[in-house]
């Protein structure tokens, strides 16, 4: 009996330990290993040419992303699934001592696509062609790691957790029977796997990715308070209840106090 009881207690402990380990793995995104790529820059000295972009964040100043941003090559962009991810980038000084700034790094957020240019070779202008891993960085961010006249430099990069101030934000655009919701200021892993929406008179409804970080619903939700359920690309799910009051209008942005880790 004593042996059986001890075995049962041990099994329960191991099950609890496994649960805790799995929870910790899902609960906090950690930095990846280092990889090699190349980086160029665009958008001008004030990064005004980086506004908008294929992720749909719009004005990067007002949405909190600033000038530490980059457009990702086709492979890294992953049809928009990488929007919002954060990368620490440093120039590979050992590979290019002439144009690399040694001992510095910059953390950027993915906000745009660097489109392929199949008219040019991959190593002579077609920098963002598959299968290249490439960052076309906002000029102010690039100048923290590279010398302007270099134009293109070899880099080392790693995925890192996104550190954000405040909670996740929801901007509601569209029209009747077409809600287009921009989900921004996402911390932790930074990118989103799925979004669901719920009106005060409906159940939960899955949204579809329209483009970038804009998620679409075709329900009629006017006059209802809105709640959202967001799952990040590393499997964390947060529920944001009554984010928008019943009197919301298209074009409004609503901030929350909840954030991914």
Curated annotation (Swiss-Prot):
Keyword Ribonucleoprotein listed: no
Summary of the tissues where the protein is detected: Expressed in adventitious root primordia, coleoptiles, shoot apex, leaf primordia, panicles and flowers.
Signal sequence residues: 1-28
Keyword tags: Cell wall, Cell wall biogenesis/degradation, Disulfide bond, Membrane, Secreted, Signal
Induction of synthesis: By gibberellin (GA3) and wounding.
Subcellular location: Secreted, Cell wall; Membrane
GO terms (BP aspect): plant-type cell wall loosening
Domain Expansin-like EG45: 52-167
Residue stretches making up the Expansin-like CBD domain: 177-256
InterPro entries named in the record: Expan_Lol_pI, Expansin, Expansin/allergen_DPBB_dom, Expansin_CBD, Expansin_CBD_sf, RlpA-like_DPBB, RlpA-like_sf
Broad class of where this protein is predominantly found: secreted
Gene3D superfamilies referenced in this protein's UniProt entry, alphabetically: Expansin, cellulose-binding-like domain, RlpA-like domain
SUPFAM superfamilies the UniProt entry points to: Barwin-like endoglucanases (SSF50685), PHL pollen allergen (SSF49590)
Covalent S-S links between cysteines: 55-83, 86-162, 91-100
Bilayer topology: Peripheral membrane protein
Domain of life: Eukaryota
One Pfam short name: DPBB_1
GO cellular component entries: extracellular region; membrane
Family affiliation: Belongs to the expansin family. Expansin A subfamily.
PANTHER family in the record: EXPANSIN-A15
Stated role: May cause loosening and extension of plant cell walls by disrupting non-covalent bonding between cellulose microfibrils and matrix glucans. No enzymatic activity has been found. May be required for rapid internodal elongation in deepwater rice during submergence.
Protein name: Expansin-A1
Naturally occurring in which organism (per UniProt): Oryza sativa subsp. japonica (Rice)
Upper classification of the organism: Eukaryota, Viridiplantae, Streptophyta, Embryophyta, Tracheophyta
């Amino acid at each position: 009996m004593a042996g059986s009881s001890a075995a049962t207690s041990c099994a329960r402990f191991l099950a609890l330990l496994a649960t805790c380990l799995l929870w910790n793995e899902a609960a906090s995104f950690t930095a990846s290993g280092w990889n090699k790529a190349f980086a160029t820059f665009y958008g001008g000295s004030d990064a005004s040419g980086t506004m908008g972009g294929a992720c749909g964040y719009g004005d990067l100043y007002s949405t909190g992303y600033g000038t530490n941003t980059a457009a990702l090559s086709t492979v890294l962009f992953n049809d928009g699934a990488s929007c919002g991810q954060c990368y620490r980038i440093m120039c590979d000084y050992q590979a290019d001592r002439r144009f690399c700034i040694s001992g510095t790094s910059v953390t950027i957020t993915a906000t745009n696509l660097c489109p392929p240019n199949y008219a040019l070779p991959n190593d002579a202008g077609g920098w963002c062609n598959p299968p290249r891993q490439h960052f076309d960085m906002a000029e102010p961010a690039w100048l923290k790691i590279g010398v302007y006249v270099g134009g293109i430099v070899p880099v080392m990069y790693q995925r890192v957790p996104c550190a954000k101030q405040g909670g996740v934000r929801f901007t509601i655009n569209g029209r009747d029977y077409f809600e287009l919701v921009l989900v921004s200021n996402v911390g932790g892993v930074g990118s989103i796997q799925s979004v669901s929406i719920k009106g005060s008179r409906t159940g939960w409804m899955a949204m579809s990715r329209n483009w970038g970080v804009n998620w679409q619903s075709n329900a009629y939700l006017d006059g209802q308070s809105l709640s959202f359920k967001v799952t990040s690309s590393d499997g964390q799910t947060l529920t944001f209840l009554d984010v928008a009051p019943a009197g919301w209008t298209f074009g409004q942005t609503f901030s929350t106090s909840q954030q991914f880790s």
